[in-house]
Regions:
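Extracellular carbohydrate-recognition regions
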Residues: 1-24, 184-228
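Extracellular glycan-recognition surfaces and repeat-rich motifs
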Residues: 14-45, 94-95, 217-244
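Secretory/extracellular carbohydrate-interaction modules
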Residues: 47-107
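Short tryptophan-centered beta-strand motifs in secreted/extracellular beta-sheet-rich domains
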Residues: 127-138, 145-147
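Flexible glycan-contacting loops in extracellular carbohydrate-active proteins
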Residues: 157-182
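Intrinsically disordered, compositionally biased repeat/linker segments
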Residues: 205, 209-222, 227-232, 245, ...
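Short, aromatic/His-centered strand-loop micro-motif at the edge of beta-sheets
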Residues: 110-131
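A short beta-strand element within beta-rich, extracytoplasmic domains
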Residues: 69-73, 262-264, 268-286, 346, ...
Length: 406
């Protein structure tokens, strides 16, 4: 069973990726976008379409020595130079990457500024989704790169360098380029045995009904000041993309008060669950410090995952005022099958400082799932530019992060 540390299909739909709060990305280079016209599964995918520029997104990792991942990629126009799809920056030594050969249209492994592996057997075509599985291993004195394209393995490529650690994963090129590249269905693990992760997709689950509140009177309210309980909570925090038009706020101190929402069930055709990531969009009335908490559970809060703060150790939600949204995310503990996915709930509130009021803008759970090879992902894998050849070759979506160039 895959043990992810980060996953995304970009299903939160934030059109302009942001580092606000660190919940989505930690570093962004250039102006990538998240769009809905071309995707592998679900409703959204990342687009990297620089014009003589570098567009890359980075997600920090907790200094692992092995990074395993899967992503889906699709070129709408070719890279003009040899450039990365995904790479990992290391604490010492040279970075490890998987790049496209701009001449042959094939992928190859690369140790930055040092050496390149042979081209993969697969010649890529435009407007076609491919699955990239990869493993970067810097745990010993021999660094190793393994990868597959649609299940066809490349020869392992190695380099003698001291054991080190990885700081992040980067998706996108490190060199200035003009191209159009789509990325979807990213899963990242730090467990060597998870390679290859294989075919899959991503679905967004949103709050679909109210649970059992302890909202108090004039404590947990909607954006209009109506008490939660007198009005529904779930439909105030279930927008994609996130919107501050509606939200839940805590208007008075109440460390035991909260609003509870239940997420909808997974509907995508799948054979297993890889994992789930809870995402919070939040802000505050002003930027003066305050408190709040967001927790999620798959067993009615016998256990919980802290998305941001918890009922006893609340977190500051005052990063920005209502003109800006901020994001936190966490991998949901022990969400591993349909039973746990379909039981997901969230609670928001618990504040001991409501000056200014904390605002819960939106909640979403991204669920990564397994599909049987040869079965299409659930939704909308066809776009206006697809050809019959592209459709027959289609599969489903994976990821990577650094600041130097190669």
């Amino acid at each position: 069973m895959t043990t992810p540390v980060w996953l995304t299909g970009f299903e939160y739909g934030v059109a302009t990726p942001t580092t606000n709060g660190g919940g989505l990305f930690n570093t962004i280079t250039g102006s990538p976008s998240i769009q809905s016209a071309t995707k592998n599964s679900g409703s959204y995918a990342l687009r990297l379409n620089p014009s003589s520029a570098i567009y890359t997104v980075f997600k920090n990792l907790a200094s692992p020595t092995i990074v395993v991942g899967r992503l889906y990629f699709r070129f709408a126009s070719w890279s003009g130079v040899d450039n990365e799809l995904v790479y990992v920056p290391v604490a010492a030594g040279v970075n490890l990457a998987i790049k496209i050969n701009a001449t042959t249209k094939k992928l190859f492994a690369r140790f930055w500024s040092t050496s390149s592996g042979s081209d993969h057997a697969t010649t890529l075509a435009l407007n076609t989704w491919y699955r990239l599985d990869f493993r970067f291993d810097v745990s010993t004195g021999t660094s190793k790169i393994d990868f597959q394209v649609d299940g066809v393995a490349a020869t392992q490529f190695t380099l003698a360098q001291s054991a080190t650690t990885v700081s992040s994963i980067a998706i996108g090129p490190s060199n200035s380029d003009t191209m159009d590249l789509f990325i979807d269905d990213v899963v990242v693990s730090v467990t060597t045995g998870d390679y290859p992760i294989g075919a899959g997709g991503t679905e967004a689950l949103l709050p679909a009904s109210d649970g059992t509140h302890n909202a108090g009177t004039n404590v947990m309210e909607d954006n209009a000041g109506t008490d939660i309980g007198s009005t529904s909570a779930y439909n105030k925090i279930n927008s994609i993309p996130p919107s501050s038009t509606t939200y839940i706020r805590q208007a008075a101190v109440g460390t035991g008060n909260y609003a509870e929402v239940l997420f909808g069930d997974i509907s995508a055709t799948h054979s297993a669950i890889i994992g789930a990531m809870g995402i919070l969009a939040y802000t505050s009335a002003t930027t003066t410090s305050n408190q709040g908490a967001t927790i999620m559970s798959k067993d009615s809060f016998s256990s919980q995952t802290d998305i941001w703060g918890n009922p006893t150790t609340r977190a500051d939600m005052s990063d920005g005022s209502t003109s800006n949204l901020y994001y936190k995310s966490a991998l949901l503990a022990d969400v591993v099958d349909d039973t746990t996915v379909n039981a997901l709930k969230a609670r928001v509130g618990y504040s001991n400082d409501v000056s200014p009021n904390p605002y819960w803008i939106d909640l979403v759970v991204e669920v990564a799932y397994v599909i049987t090879t040869g079965i299409s992902a659930t939704v909308n894998q066809v776009t206006e530019t697809d050809t019959a050849q592209a459709i027959t070759k289609r599969k489903i979506k994976a990821v990577a992060q650094v600041t130097e160039t190669d």
